[in-house]
């Protein structure tokens, strides 16, 4: 599957982390700073010409990534693919790092070769504010959250469903089918974590879903109401999205990915707080 390093055009895969706080999302757009543009500029400084970077997931403004996967075509091919990570880190701002890089076949694509993506949403439930938790979580404390209730609400989402109720306007996607492969809600001290794995995600889906699950977990909305809303695609009853800062792209799944599993953060939360 993987090409051997040689002079000439070479496709390179990257595993990246970033803090999304000061960026207007992954995707390049005029007049706004984006992750894609920052990394493309760094690559261009090295190869001396513009390149296009393709990401596995188009995270929104303010959303973080523990392991975003991307690829680009090195037009020169003189740099060994495994060295690109260290080279790029010398040209990137401090809130973006490349953890690893490797050669991939010319047909491999960071987005279209992905089998699934996994997101984690973090909620800080202690009444006392925490400066460090505030950067990466939603401070939700006025109503107690019951993680078992949230888990019970999430489990019927498993499988392939129309999830139009959790699809923000403005997306070019023509359908709302999503195959949800895994869901989990658990607590670590004052932190409540919601994880969801799917073959793909609708625009704004996780944040809209978490916003409603917080209502269910705090007793403001019943499980029956929640099920009726998503089954009947009642987007008009989904009132608000959870803040972007609590969301993190955790991992992307591929067949025979060339970089080691140690680059992924899928077993424990990245940030834990005791209050």
UniProtKB/Swiss-Prot annotation:
This is tRNA pseudouridine synthase A. It is an enzyme of class 5 (isomerase). Formation of pseudouridine at positions 38, 39 and 40 in the anticodon stem and loop of transfer RNAs. It catalyses: uridine(38/39/40) in tRNA = pseudouridine(38/39/40) in tRNA. Gene3D superfamilies: Pseudouridine synthase I, catalytic domain, C-terminal subdomain, Pseudouridine synthase I, catalytic domain, N-terminal subdomain. Pfam families: PseudoU_synth_1. The keyword tRNA processing applies. It comes from Synechocystis sp. (strain ATCC 27184 / PCC 6803 / Kazusa).
């Amino acid at each position: 599957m993987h090409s051997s390093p040689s002079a000439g055009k070479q496709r390179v895969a990257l595993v990246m982390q970033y803090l999304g706080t000061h960026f207007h999302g992954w995707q390049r757009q005029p007049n706004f700073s984006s992750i894609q543009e920052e990394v493309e500029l760094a690559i261009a400084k090295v190869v001396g010409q513009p390149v296009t970077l393709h990401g596995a997931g188009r995270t929104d403004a303010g959303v973080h990534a523990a392991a975003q996967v991307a690829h680009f075509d090195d037009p020169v091919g003189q740099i060994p693919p495994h060295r690109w990570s260290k080279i790029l880190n010398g040209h990137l701002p401090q809130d973006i790092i490349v953890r690893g890089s490797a050669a991939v076949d010319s047909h491999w694509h960071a987005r279209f070769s992905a089998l699934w993506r996994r997101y984690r949403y973090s909620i800080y439930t202690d009444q006392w504010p925490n400066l460090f938790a505030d950067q990466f979580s939603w401070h939700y404390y006025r109503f107690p959250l019951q993680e078992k209730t949230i888990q019970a609400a999430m489990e019927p989402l498993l499988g392939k469903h129309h999830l139009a109720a959790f699809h923000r306007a403005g997306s070019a996607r023509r359908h709302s089918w999503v195959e949800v492969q895994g869901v989990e809600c658990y607590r670590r001290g004052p932190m409540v974590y919601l994880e969801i794995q799917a073959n793909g995600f609708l625009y704004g889906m996780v944040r809209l879903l978490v916003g409603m699950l917080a209502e269910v977990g705090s007793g403001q909305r019943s499980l029956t109401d929640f099920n009726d809303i998503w089954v009947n695609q009642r987007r008009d009853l989904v009132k608000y999205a959870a803040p972007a800062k609590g969301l993190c792209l955790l991992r992307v799944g591929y067949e025979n990915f060339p970089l080691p599993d140690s680059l992924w953060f899928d077993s424990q939360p990245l940030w834990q707080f005791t209050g």
